[in-house]
Every structure is written in C-alpha cells, then in structure tokens.
Amino acid sequence: KLLYPDDTVQHAGVVTGLGGFAGHSHKYARKDASGYMFRLATVQNFSAVTAACLLCPAKIYDEVGGLDEKFEVAFNDVDFCLRVRDAGYRILYTPYAVLYHHESKSRGLDVKGEAKARFDRERARLEQKHTRKGLLCDPYYNPNLTLDREDFSENDVLPKE
C-alpha cells in the first residue's frame, strides 16, 4: 500500500478501466480505513500494481520480456502486469507492505505540454496493446461499480449485456 505524505492512500492496487484506462483503487482513503468490502486490509489479486513498489521473480520478469521501454513514464507497470497475468501468473496486492510515495514529485504531473502529449501517446499504446474493451473488463472489479471514480461507488448506469 502506498500512502501520500498526508496519510491518505495513493495506491492499493490498479483497476483497469477506471477513468477509461486504469486507476488506483481506494485513492485518497484514510490509511487506517478498511475500504470497500474490506479490500484495503485484505491480501488479494488485482489486474495490476504500480511499479513504485513492485516485486517480481526475475524468471517471470524475463519470461514476459520485462518492462516495455516504449512506455517512458506512464503505464509501463500496467502493461507489464497485464502481460504477467496473461502468462498465467497472479498479481498480488498486500496491505502489509506500507510505504510513503511522493507521486510525481521528481518529474511533475502529466497535465500540459510535452508531458501531456507523451502521456496521451502512452495511453494510446496501452489501448493498442491490450484493447480498450480488454482494459474496461477488469476480472477483479465488479461491473456494477463505477469506472468514473476510484472509490468503489455504484455505477449510475446499468451495464449493457
């Protein structure tokens, strides 16, 4: 679990489809909160975790080809984890490893100029490699929950069959 300096959750697993591509579960929850269905306090599978704190056996890393260097900054971890999952392995989140993470402190945010252009290119690459439909169907996330927010709230629109 990664925490912001203000003791709120920055990352507790990645849900693909959040925000249209991928997002962090329970973002901004209190560090001592149990989360939706006790998920902040439970060891569980996720589609991805952030590379800010990711451990992987070298054998698996090599088997899937490591991190794709064409993702210079964003989504290299999501792409890597999806390839690990596609190879038949699981991506595990544990609440028992807790670190503070100053997200984007050293590089800034991807909101304007070249940083935004790079982010948009990397997002398009993620969708190209894993398909938009594939990203929107996270097997570890309830389809009745919203993809608009990272708080596990209910979806306002019923999913289409």
Question: How would you describe each model-predicted region?
Answer:
Residues 1-64, 78, 87, 98-110, ...:
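Acidic/His-rich active-site region of diverse nucleotide-sugar glycosyltransferases
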Residues 73-74:
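A short, glycine-/small-residue-rich helix N-cap motif at loop->alpha-helix starts
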Residues 90:
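Residue-level detector of anion-binding/catalytic polar loops
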Residues 111-137:
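Catalytic core of nucleotide-sugar-dependent glycosyltransferases
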Residues 126, 132, 136-146, 151-156:
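Long, domain-scale regions corresponding to catalytic signaling modules most often appended to membrane systems
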